[in-house]
Amino acid sequence: MKQRGPAGGRSSSPKPSAPGSGAGEGPDGRSAPASQKINKASANDRSLDSVIAADKIAALKLAPVSRETEARLDRYIALLREWQAKTNLVAPSTLPHLWTRHIADSLQLVDLAPTARRWADLGSGGGFPGVVLACTMAETPGASVHLVERIAKKAAFLREAIRITTSPGVVHLAEIGDNVDRITGPVDCVTARALAPLHQLIGFAEPLMRQGAKALFPKGQDVEAELTEAAKYWNIQPQLHQSRTGDGWIVELNAAERRG
């Protein structure tokens, strides 16, 4: 049987908390000084710094780069972490693994198109792989990377990333499907990462592929299902390359013809 409190079943008033028992309070019951909160945030930042530093070592073993490219990537990552606080550029859970999850995953595309100097990255978002590709080609004569992004804040970040890394990138603020035809000059390779299902990506990239571009699309473990779906709309002969950085795959296409 439930016990009833005094005054017609109302529960008694809660006892006052003991001094210092409130969240953020010191032993005298006062709020913890701001300096303590700042020190805690600084400690968290230092911890994340050391995790990212170790992740960088692992990533550069998977995908080695020159010292000049490494320096550019360092500036890019520093900028991304700064902007991440106000603009969601990457999933927060992936921050400790920026180098292996995002940088190395992007760098492996270069080896699949070693002669490509002119790239198009559709739906660049936080710059993967577009900014990474641009960093690797900063000293390549005639190199350029077109980064197409529809969200203004992300496009602003991409422009700043290209500026501080002194990389050969051109940012287009536009809807993906509306802008591909406007890219001037030939494109050797078109890519898109975490943007849309494969059959839609082919639709975005087909105008460039028709002009001779190769397509490289990083995909996850469900690549076979995406290929099956894409084959309903497109005649394609895909090549699959296993990712170095996880269980995913990279779909390579040299041509695509829409089914009647």
Swiss-Prot record:
UniProt keyword annotation of Coiled coil present: no
E.C. designation(s): 2.1.1.170
Localization per Swiss-Prot or TrEMBL: Cytoplasm
Catalytic function, reaction form: guanosine(527) in 16S rRNA + S-adenosyl-L-methionine = N(7)-methylguanosine(527) in 16S rRNA + S-adenosyl-L-homocysteine
UniProt GO molecular function: rRNA (guanine-N7-)-methyltransferase activity
Biased composition (Polar residues): 33-45
Positions with biased composition (Low complexity): 9-20
Stretches for region Disordered: 1-45
Protein name, entry field: Ribosomal RNA small subunit methyltransferase G
Taxonomic lineage: Bacteria, Pseudomonadati, Pseudomonadota, Alphaproteobacteria, Hyphomicrobiales
